[in-house]
Amino acid sequence: MKSQIKLFIELTRLNKPIGIMLLFWPCSWGLAYAYNYTKNLSQFLFYFLLFFFGSVLMRSAGCIINDIVDKDYDKKVKRTKQRPIAANLVSVTQALIYSALLCLVAFFILIQFNKLTIILGLSSMLLAFSYPFMKRITYWPQLFLGVTFN
């Protein structure tokens, strides 16, 4: 029996951080280009950390939502059948609670930004969480996800 922590790490794909970096690096580059370096660097570091933790939280929540939506498909695919929800190691209810908590913490990070950023951040969630459904209507769902991330 796997520990709950290990299951959570697998569920959120924290053991596979490339997705976090794909979300985080465009944010950090945008911040680096936009920041006025004549000001205090502590503000830059503050926003840098907000972007990093926001990326970790939202990518993790997105992975959980993806696994919930795809659980029946994941059970049939060799590469994905051992994912915690597909393997019935984590219930859909538990996964929804985990995802909601991650989104709640991410929301508290998001409200540290200005109004436009909050609106854009909330609207991008709709795009990100629609990704699992794109797999049912196109052979290129990753293109949709890439556009969503950037």
Specify the residue positions occupied by each region the protein language model found.
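Hydrophobic positions within alpha-helical membrane elements
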Residues: 20, 64, 72-75, 79, ...
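Membrane-interface helix starts
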Residues: 13-23
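Small-residue-rich segments of transmembrane alpha-helices in multi-pass membrane proteins
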Residues: 21-33, 84, 144-150
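Cytosolic, membrane-interface loops and tails of multi-pass inner-membrane proteins
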Residues: 1-6, 63-90
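Intramembrane alpha-helical segments
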Residues: 9-10, 83-150
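Juxtamembrane/transmembrane-helix boundary motifs in multi-pass membrane proteins
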Residues: 2, 6, 14, 38-46, ...
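Perimembrane helix-loop junctions in membrane proteins
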Residues: 34, 38, 71-74, 135-139
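Membrane-embedded alpha-helical segments that form the functional core of polytopic membrane enzymes
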Residues: 27-28, 32-69, 79, 103-107, ...
